[in-house]
C-alpha cells in the first residue's frame, strides 16, 4: 500500500485473489503489464472489466482488423453517421463463436473514420447510443460463397470482407452489392458509373495526370448489369479537385473516397 499508484485518482486498485505464491504474482504482474501496453497502443485488451466482449477465440481474433476496416469503409460510403442502424452479419464458421469483439471493432472503425474524439473498444458502443444508432448483429453458420464472411450495412450502403488463403489476407468482396475482390488500402476511391466502354481509361488517366500512382484497381458489376462500380487503391490521397473532376465526367454517378 506504499506504492504511489494508490494516490493516483485515475487508477482503481483491486486485490488479485488468484496469485497466492510469489511466482504466480510475478506472472500476474507480467500479464497486467502486457495488457497496459495493449491499451496504450489502442488495441483490444483481453479481460478488460469495462469491455463487454467475452473471451476472444483464436478463430475470431484475426478478423478484428478486417472488421475495423469494414467499419471505416462503411463510414466513408455513408458520408458520416447514419440516422437509424448499423447491421453486421457474420456468416460461416465464424458464427459458431462469440463475435462481440468484432462488433466492437466495426463500431471502432466506423466512428474513428467519422472523426471527432478518440474512439476505443470501450466508448464505441456509447458513441452509437449517443448518435441514436441501433447496432444489429446477426449470425448464420450457413456459408455465403466464403468459409467466413463479415457484412456491414447502413442505409443504402454495404461492405463485405473475408480473410483468404493460408496467410489470412484481408479481402473486400462486396461494396454496395457489387461483387469484387480487392485488398483494403489506406487510400481508396469508389467510382459508381454507367456500364459503358472507356470508363476505366477515363478514370485511370484522370488520376494518373494528377501524379497519383494507382496501386490496384478492380471493377465490379451487379446483377442488373446496367451500372458498374470501380474501386481504385492509390499510394496517396486523390486530391479534391480530381475527385470533383471525376464526378463531373459523363456516365459517372458518384465518386467517394474511403479508407480501408
Where are these regions (language model features)?
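Rossmann-like dinucleotide-binding domain for NAD(H)/NADP(H)
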Residues: 1-79, 95, 113-115, 259
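A conserved regulatory-domain signal marking ACT and ACT-like small-molecule sensing domains
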Residues: 53-260
Amino acid at each position: 500500500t506504499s506504492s504511489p499508484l494508490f494516490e493516483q485518482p485515475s487508477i482503481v486498485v483491486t486485490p488479485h485473489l488468484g496469485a497466492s505464491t510469489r511466482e504466480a504474482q510475478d506472472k500476474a504482474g507480467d500479464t497486467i503489464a502486457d495488457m497496459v501496453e495493449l491499451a496504450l497502443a489502442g488495441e483490444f485488451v483481453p479481460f478488460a472489466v469495462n469491455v463487454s466482449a467475452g473471451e476472444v477465440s483464436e478463430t475470431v481474433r484475426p478478423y478484428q482488423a478486417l472488421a475495423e476496416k469494414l467499419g471505416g469503409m462503411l463510414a466513408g460510403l455513408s458520408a458520416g453517421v447514419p440516422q437509424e442502424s448499423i447491421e453486421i452479419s457474420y456468416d460461416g464458421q465464424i458464427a459458431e463463436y462469440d463475435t462481440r469483439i468484432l462488433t466492437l471493432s466495426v463500431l471502432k472503425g466506423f466512428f474513428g473514420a467519422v472523426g471527432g474524439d478518440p474512439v476505443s473498444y470501450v466508448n464505441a458502443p456509447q458513441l452509437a447510443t449517443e448518435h441514436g444508432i441501433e447496432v444489429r448483429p446477426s449470425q448464420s453458420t450457413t456459408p455465403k460463397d466464403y468459409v467466413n464472411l463479415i457484412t456491414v450495412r447502413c442505409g443504402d450502403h454495404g461492405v463485405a470482407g473475408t480473410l483468404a488463403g493460408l496467410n489470412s489476407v484481408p479481402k473486400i468482396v462486396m461494396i454496395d452489392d457489387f461483387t469484387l475482390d480487392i485488398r483494403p488500402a489506406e487510400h481508396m476511391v469508389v467510382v459508381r458509373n454507367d456500364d459503358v466502354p472507356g470508363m476505366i481509361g477515363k478514370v485511370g488517366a484522370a488520376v494518373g495526370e494528377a501524379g497519383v500512382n494507382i496501386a490496384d484497381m478492380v471493377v465490379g458489376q451487379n446483377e442488373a448489369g446496367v451500372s458498374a462500380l470501380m474501386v481504385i487503391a492509390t499510394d496517396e490521397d486523390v486530391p479534391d479537385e480530381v475527385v470533383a473532376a471525376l464526378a463531373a465526367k459523363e456516365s459517372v454517378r458518384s465518386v467517394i473516397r474511403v479508407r480501408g
